[in-house]
Amino acid sequence: MAKPTRKRRVKKNIEFGVAHIHATFNNTIVMITDVHGNALAWSSAGALGFKGSRKSTPFAAQMAAEAAAKSAQEHGLKTVEVTVKGPGSGRESAIRALAAAGLEVTAIRDVTPVPHNGARPPKRRRV
């Protein structure tokens, strides 16, 4: 029986992209796209093996950003514009990690959605 041929991933040559950092209270997801929004690379704290409350740490966000940047640099990426969404603790450390990984950060934009008093928020925790 013939083996099914796997599609080899095409290496794009893109120099400018957008790094989307989604920092929630539980996890940090870093996705690097081209200017049209087509994904080049992504990583998250959970995908790197962090579990439970360790996913929400700044160190986990830093590791996720480094992994995504390394993967995106294989496509020839050099400069990124950063969009940050969410209130999580990994916002600043993820941006610093992108810059430290060798990507030039040209702009940082906060796109956290702010409700015009929409849905009722979850009740306050009593610990």
Curated annotation (Swiss-Prot):
Keywords: Ribonucleoprotein, Ribosomal protein, RNA-binding, rRNA-binding
Single GO cellular component term: ribosome
GO MF annotation list: rRNA binding; structural constituent of ribosome
Family annotation (PROSITE patterns): RIBOSOMAL_S11
GO terms, biological process: translation
Keyword Repeat: no
Function: Located on the platform of the 30S subunit, it bridges several disparate RNA helices of the 16S rRNA. Forms part of the Shine-Dalgarno cleft in the 70S ribosome.
The family this protein is said to belong to: Belongs to the universal ribosomal protein uS11 family.
Subunit structure: Part of the 30S ribosomal subunit. Interacts with proteins S7 and S18. Binds to IF-3.
Name of the protein: Small ribosomal subunit protein uS11
Organism: Streptococcus pyogenes serotype M49 (strain NZ131)
Gene name of this polypeptide: rpsK
